[in-house]
Amino acid sequence: MALLLCLVGVTAALAHGCLHCHSKFSEKFSFYRHHVNLKSWWVGDIPVSGALLTDWSDDTMKELHLAIPAEITREKLDQVATAVYQRMDQLYQGKMYFPGYFPNELRNIFREQVHLIQNAIIESRLDCQRHCGIFQYETISCNNCTDSHVACFGYNCESSEQWESAVQGLLNYINNWHKQDVSMRATPAFLVSPAFRCLEPPHLANLTLEDAAECLKQH
């Protein structure tokens, strides 16, 4: 049995990308797009760089390759955004670059951003797993930028009493879920998500972020 049951609602929506949900994204990327023609000596770099910036959000969702819902906390989204904007602002502080340099740097920042988002989502997931019983944390859906939450059932209980309380809490949670309006309730992800052997109790003690990332990414 997987170490947790993640009860995230699954919503079909157009992909926007996690960074797109940040409050400064529109302002920042509008500036980046409007000043891209000043960053390269070679005119061919301009349309390539412009396309990279325009497709940034959709390409992010395509590259995440996560086997779990793309839900990120506001705190971690702020951390990712700060890192990305800092790299981008530094790149734009320079004058005109030699041919090929500017779009290559944009690709490097993009790849770094994808990695940061993956780790942010996975770290929160692992933290959630290390509780006993039902635990919830607030998130933003990277699919549609709406407020959401992740509810997990963790097996990290230290006594039979804690375990009994955890199981009762899970039963109450499921019972309350069944009472909700079918058209309004979120579908618990443990009904549709696969189990991940790397997250089972025998493997958790020595689980590193790198191992978890490998486990929770789709191939």
UniProtKB/Swiss-Prot annotation:
<dbReference type="GO" id="GO:0005634">
    <property type="term" value="C:nucleus"/>
</dbReference>
<comment type="similarity">
    <text>Belongs to the Izumo family.</text>
</comment>
<feature type="signal peptide">
    <location>
        <begin position="1"/>
        <end position="15"/>
    </location>
</feature>
<keyword id="KW-0964">Secreted</keyword>
<keyword id="KW-0325">Glycoprotein</keyword>
<feature type="glycosylation site" description="N-linked (GlcNAc...) asparagine">
    <location>
        <position position="206"/>
    </location>
</feature>
<dbReference type="Pfam" id="PF15005">
    <property type="entry name" value="IZUMO"/>
</dbReference>
<keyword id="KW-0732">Signal</keyword>
<protein>
    <recommendedName>
        <fullName>Izumo sperm-egg fusion protein 4</fullName>
    </recommendedName>
</protein>
<dbReference type="InterPro" id="IPR029389">
    <property type="entry name" value="IZUMO"/>
</dbReference>
<dbReference type="InterPro" id="IPR052868">
    <property type="entry name" value="Izumo_fusion"/>
</dbReference>
<dbReference type="GO" id="GO:0005576">
    <property type="term" value="C:extracellular region"/>
</dbReference>
